[in-house]
């Protein structure tokens, strides 16, 4: 087995074993973390978070065997995050989700020990400083990931466009065209956030991420959530294993400070 297929979320290839192939898994700025809201430091110097997302920059939707991912055209600065803790704009490369088998777990970050059923990650890279996503992903200030918690409740009308496309990528390594999806529709009303220096939450676990975790969750219906759970970790020819519990548990903070853009 080669490349990204030598890790997963099972008993033998799951997060507790990743350090064998990726020693950085035990590094000093690993993600996700449990955000202890009372210990987050309000930082008035933090800028407001600005998300400039153009409507028609999405390209495709893919089941990569670990999650479902939407890729974006990142050839220019039309779809970026800026402000917040960031110096300059970071371009949106892709978004993906993590979710659980049941509604009491699924998110990667937790808040005061509480898990959410799912977490959306919007992955951006520093194109002002680095020439490729790969180069940025290896640099300490290369990536900015915006995390959004999902909870179940009312249906999220804008999410239907995405959940209705999931049947096309049910199996691992399947891909479909997915154009003109604006991820702005998946953001909560409030832009309050926590931020801290961290890592990718999947191998190679590079410590290259400025994390921006939005405080306010978005809501989707249980029916919409079930469509994520109907995806498969496996290819069409393999025994079917449902794609659930594809999250890494919280990692030690190791002295890092979590900053808050708001006063608790």
Swiss-Prot record:
Keywords recorded for this protein, A-Z: Cytoplasm, Lyase, Metal-binding, Zinc
InterPro entries, A to Z: Alpha_CA_VII (IPR041890), CA_dom (IPR001148), CA_dom_sf (IPR036398), Carbonic_anhydrase_a-class (IPR023561), Carbonic_anhydrase_a-class_CS (IPR018338)
An individual GO BP term: positive regulation of cellular pH reduction
One Gene Ontology term, aspect cellular component: cytosol
Signal in keyword set: no
EC numbers for this chain: 4.2.1.1
Binding site for Zn(2+): 96, 98, 121
Catalytic reaction list: hydrogencarbonate + H(+) = CO2 + H2O
Annotated Alpha-carbonic anhydrase domain residues: 5-262
GO terms for MF: carbonate dehydratase activity; zinc ion binding
Top class in the EC scheme: lyase
Domain of life: Eukaryota
Binding site for substrate: 201-202
CDD domains: alpha_CA_VII
Active site, UniProt feature: 66
Disulphides: none
Main location: cytoplasm
Subcellular location: Cytoplasm
Record's function text: Reversible hydration of carbon dioxide.
PANTHER family documented for this protein: CARBONIC ANHYDRASE, CARBONIC ANHYDRASE 7
Family: Belongs to the alpha-carbonic anhydrase family.
Protein name (record): Carbonic anhydrase 7
